[in-house]
């Protein structure tokens, strides 16, 4: 496929949470992880796989194939709203699965003087030379990385997402060592990332974040169940039906532990 073509799940014209200022958000299709609390399961299915395409279309979901130039042209309509630090954010799905497209989009954006931000789980990151060569190019065009750390414990992370967190933590260290600004995000899930009587994993995560030199913000987001109807419509069993959102007390405690680091 043309490496400047992206599989676009959707776009958002005035995003206010995925990076500084108002953002034009590009949500890319496809993700390898299967986070038990994911609220966008329709973004899992990678393309151009024909079975995945047929499945999505049978549920009324049409993913667009677009060039980076075309997406940038759409984004530029909103440039006048970015005077206070806004710009373009690419999210997912998992944006790094379409790294060639992101590189091209951000390269074009930087030519226009636009702030760029990548929201990622870090799951595709690897220290292999072939990937790092592309990742280093991406770093040249990326002003901010938002890294979602699902769980600090490797085994718990596997249970939660289906994957180890080793490469994700490696990515955080790599960004830190190479002077790339990042925000850290963490979703608070009762019984999974915070225990009923213990915050040990939050303290472990806090220690890891303290070891990073370029973290400028830490966000703790409460788990929610807003994605349940999507699972039902796709015929996918919801993995954690009995888990409720965190209490205000739990959320406040988690933010006290994590958000005061920077």
Each model region followed by its residue ranges:
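N-terminal [4Fe-4S]-dependent radical SAM core
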Residues: 1-65, 77-84
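Auxiliary Fe-S-binding modules of radical SAM enzymes
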Residues: 1-20, 73, 188-262
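Generic domain-boundary/flexible-linker signal
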Residues: 19, 37, 46-49, 99, ...
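Short, electropositive, low-hydrophobicity segments enriched in small/polar residues
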Residues: 23-25, 34, 96-97, 126, ...
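Flexible, glycine- and charge-enriched loops at secondary-structure boundaries
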Residues: 28, 61-65, 161-165, 195-199, ...
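Short glycine-enriched, charge-decorated loop/helix-capping segments at active-site entrances
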Residues: 44, 57-61, 158-164, 235-243
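Conserved AdoMet/S-adenosylmethionine-binding subsite of the radical SAM
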Residues: 72-87, 92-221, 226
